[in-house]
Regions:
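Flexible, processing/modification-adjacent segments and terminal tails
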Residues: 1-56, 79-80, 135-138
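A generic structural signal for solvent-exposed, polar alpha-helical segments
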Residues: 12, 17-18, 23, 67, ...
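Gly/Pro-enriched, hydrophobic low-complexity segments
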Residues: 39-129
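Long terminal segments
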Residues: 126-138
Length: 138
């Protein structure tokens, strides 16, 4: 159950890095503007093997100027014409050694925290941990 939640939830934070996942298949689809009118290259992301979400397809807009992911769509099935959602991918900020975006339209992420290390109890105690008491990477 935890793995299923992590696979789903991690997309909302680190989806651009999923382009390099083992089993990822990328296909160049051409060029298209985002919903805000910015020109982008389009990639399709599918997985050869993904037992937790078989058949899901992603459409990813790569901004022509910044070369960063600028929009993301997810389709429930490979053959679906209409996506489940289309969200912007904006407001990139440096968090330690990683570049992350927080703007997702109505799904914005406002509490991104990146750590260089955490004590073991964070991973073994299933009560909600107050992560603000630990030192964040800058």
């Amino acid at each position: 159950q935890g793995k299923r939640h992590w696979l789903n939830d991690s997309y909302w934070l680190v989806m651009p890095y999923k382009l390099k996942d083992a089993g990822a298949t990328l296909k160049y689809l051409g060029t298209e503007s985002t919903q805000t009118g910015k020109p982008a290259d389009i990639l399709q992301l599918t997985y050869k093997t993904n037992n937790l979400s078989p058949g899901i397809r992603h459409k990813i807009w790569i901004d022509k100027k910044s070369r960063l992911v600028s929009q993301w769509a997810q389709y429930a099935k490979l053959t679906d014409k209409q996506p489940l959602f289309v969200v912007p991918w904006d407001d990139y900020q440096q968090h330690g050694d990683i570049l992350l975006a927080s703007e997702r339209g109505s799904h914005d992420i406002s509490d991104i925290m990146v750590f260089t290390g955490l004590p073991g109890e964070v991973f073994s105690d299933f009560t909600r941990t107050d992560l603000s008491r630990y030192h964040e990477a800058k």
